[in-house]
């Protein structure tokens, strides 16, 4: 599977790269025809810092108190907070970086000690990859519960442009991967044609079948 990987560079910054592997993959709520590998961006500080700088440029005029990191984006989130605090409307600000917990029914929650970082705050969602937007929907439900104000959605890769009226600013989009498709399991043409699933995919990575 790995031998099929192709490297894609971000427009305007060749230091920011993702890997894409064509195939048949199953997530919790969809089937997709590409695995988007963001491992280096989420684990390597050099690329994470470059990605954070690129994302921060979009929000220089947006007041942000807190960044909620989803899908292992904490390193990028920390550099993003640093970049936001260096210039623009957030210059000098101590931007918070938090990660929600998932409870027994897969809802995002915050414990009492971190709720104050959300309640009444201007919040930016940072997510690794968006295919259907369902993870964003869960995060938005969480924000409403804790009275946070969503001011933006930032992503490394997104197959959609917006979610419930909020634009998704992504470093990589469907323009970089025009053949990217997502299907419900019942409507997946790869399943219907008998193509076996290559791997199970979640926010941590993939497991071959």
What are these regions (language model features)?
Residues 74-124, 131-134:
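Short, glycine/charge-rich flexible loops or terminal/linker lids adjacent to PRPP-binding catalytic cores
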Residues 65, 121, 151:
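Conserved acidic residues
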Residues 1-63, 203-209:
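Active-site-facing substrate-recognition patch
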Residues 57, 82, 86, 141, ...:
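Short, well-ordered alpha-helices that flank and scaffold nucleotide-derived cofactor binding pockets
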Residues 2-10, 140-209:
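PRPP-dependent phosphoribosyltransferase catalytic core
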Residues 130-139, 143:
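A phosphate-binding catalytic loop at a beta-strand-loop-alpha-helix junction
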Residues 69, 125-126:
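Hydrophobic Val/Ile/Leu positions in short beta-strands of Rossmann-like dinucleotide-binding domains
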Residues 62-72:
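Short glycine-rich phosphate-binding loop at a beta-alpha junction
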């Amino acid at each position: 599977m790995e031998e099929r990987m192709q490297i894609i560079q971000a427009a305007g910054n060749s230091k920011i790269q993702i890997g894409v592997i064509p195939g048949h993959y199953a997530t919790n709520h969809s089937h997709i025809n590409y695995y988007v590998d963001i491992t280096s961006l989420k684990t390597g500080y050099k690329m994470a810092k470059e990605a954070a700088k690129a994302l921060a440029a979009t929000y220089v005029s947006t007041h942000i108190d807190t960044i909620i990191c989803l899908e292992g984006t904490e390193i990028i989130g920390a550099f993003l907070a640093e970049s936001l605090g260096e210039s623009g409307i957030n210059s000098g600000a101590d931007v918070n970086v938090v990660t929600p917990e998932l409870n027994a029914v897969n809802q995002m929650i915050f414990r009492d000690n971190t709720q104050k970082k959300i309640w009444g705050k201007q919040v930016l969602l940072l997510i690794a990859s968006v295919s259907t937007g369902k993870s964003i929907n869960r995060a938005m439900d969480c924000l409403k519960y804790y009275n946070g104000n969503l001011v933006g959605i930032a992503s490394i890769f997104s197959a959609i442009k917006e979610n419930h009226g909020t634009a998704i600013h992504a470093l990589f989009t469907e323009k970089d991967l025009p053949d990217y498709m997502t299907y419900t399991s019942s409507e997946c043409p790869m399943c219907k044609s008998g193509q076996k699933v290559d791997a199970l995919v979640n926010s941590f990575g993939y497991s071959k079948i």
